[in-house]
Amino acid sequence: CYFQNCPRGXXXAMSDLELRQCLPCGPGGKGRCFGPSICCGDELGCFVGTAEALRCQEEIYLPSPCQSGQKPCGSGGRCAAAGICCNDESCVTEPECREGIGFPRRVXASDRSNATLLDGPSGALLLRLVQLAAAPEPAEPAQPGVY
């Protein structure tokens, strides 16, 4: 079960147990479940309500509590990917999750400039974050998709 929504019996026994990492998910199992429909990883970004996050529904039925992410952020969330904070229900952009433990900048020594490499999912995530930052606030809740 997810730490935030475990039944009283399972969460009360938390002092006796150590929290385990939630189930792996996403392409190649490189992400971790943050909620029943949220899968995030350093290299992947976050999948919300997509096929990549389907496995995360299994976590609800496991008796021991789990928690993904290392650094607390936002309102009861944890840093899920570079610049993203998630709780078990949703994700938001969060500057304090941009760099640090688990989200190092990668710089190639062979590059003539000291720019950060943005390959594949990292570049796509950055582009999406820039688009989201420039977009007006949506009038209705976000639809399932890749963020």
From Swiss-Prot:
Cellular localization per UniProt: Secreted
Glycine amide modified-residue sites: 9
Major localisation: secreted
Keywords, in A-Z order: Amidation, Cleavage on pair of basic residues, Disulfide bond, Glycoprotein, Hormone, Secreted, Vasoactive, Vasoconstrictor
GO (cellular component) term, any one: extracellular space
Pfam family membership, one: Hormone_5
Residues under site feature: Important for agonist activity on V1aR/AVPR1A: 9
Glycosylated residue positions: 114
Disulfide bonds: 1-6, 22-66, 25-39, 33-56, 40-46, 73-85, 79-97, 86-91
GO biological process assignments: vasoconstriction
An annotated Gene Ontology molecular function: V1A vasopressin receptor binding
Keyword Disulfide bond on entry: yes
Assembly behavior: Interacts with vasopressin receptors V1bR/AVPR1B (Ki=85 pM), V1aR/AVPR1A (Ki=0.6 nM) and V2R/AVPR2 (Ki=4.9 nM). Interacts with oxytocin receptor (OXTR) (Ki=110 nM).
Function text: Neurophysin 2 specifically binds vasopressin. Vasopressin has a direct antidiuretic action on the kidney, it also causes vasoconstriction of the peripheral vessels. Acts by binding to vasopressin receptors (V1bR/AVPR1B, V1aR/AVPR1A, and V2R/AVPR2).
Family, as annotated: Belongs to the vasopressin/oxytocin family.
Protein's recorded name: Vasopressin-neurophysin 2-copeptin
